[in-house]
Amino acid sequence: MTSTVERGRSFDGWAAEYDRYRPTYPDALFALIAQELQLPPRPQVVDLGAGTGRASVAMATLGWQVTAVEPGGPMLDVLRSRAIRDQLEIATVQATAEATGLGAASFNLATAAQAFHWFDKPAALAEIARVVRPGGGVALFWNVREEERSAFVADYHRILERYGGAAEGKYLQAGRATGRSTTREALAAAIEFGPAQLLELHHELTATAAGFVGMAFTASYVRALDSATQERIAREEFGMVRGNKEILYRFAEPDSARKP
């Protein structure tokens, strides 16, 4: 197991916190994906690296037929509980994105929400090409903080850079740009798919002070720090927010491509 995959699997240890604090995705994102990829009504979707189902639940709520694939048992347990609570039909499979075990040409769409960077990209795209029908597509999307448009987010990143060391500084300074380029490169190299499209959909999310700090502590690069450093980060973050101030700071960024 590679270090990247191991870091991704570290989320299993805090599945409940992940589900409580991680941001959701707007309905407009899925409308945009459906339009760009010319999906049929109620498409059959495989959601890879589904986690606790932030995207799976959103798509199922829209009436999409969702199969959630997730290697982590604790994450799947939360997803299944949410599906039962919300009376949603979501099929679940405990497997990796690189080897789902699903039938060939079974889906109109494959998605990966805030997850593709954890995958073995060539292997995952080969598996996606296998399970997606001709004329179907893949959509890879992230909620991304807008540092350029938010002084609050810029301050938050400076805290992480100060306490997180070289690895976190590298992630914050270059990770998003590198992730975008490697995603597009991986899609371009996957001969089963047509040209990739990079789309941006701006949306705003709010959080209380506790919610913001809770979200920050679901990041793998924060969880990897020692407890004393985590406590210092939490104190500074609470100081930034000053009470229950609402924070608006994210947008969704999908990459999509169609299978001829």
Language-model regions: role of each:
Residues 44-46, 52-99:
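Class I SAM-dependent methyltransferase SAM/SAH-binding core
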Residues 119-127:
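A short, conserved alpha-helix within the catalytic core of class I
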Residues 114:
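Short catalytic micro-motifs in class I SAM-dependent methyltransferases
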Residues 52, 178-260:
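Conserved Class I S-adenosyl-L-methionine
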Residues 1-41:
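Conserved class I S-adenosyl-L-methionine
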Residues 99-109:
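A short acidic, Gly/Pro-enriched loop at the edge of an enzyme's catalytic core
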Residues 130-203:
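Conserved catalytic/acceptor-binding region of the Class I
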Residues 42-43, 105:
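Nucleotide donor/acceptor-binding cores
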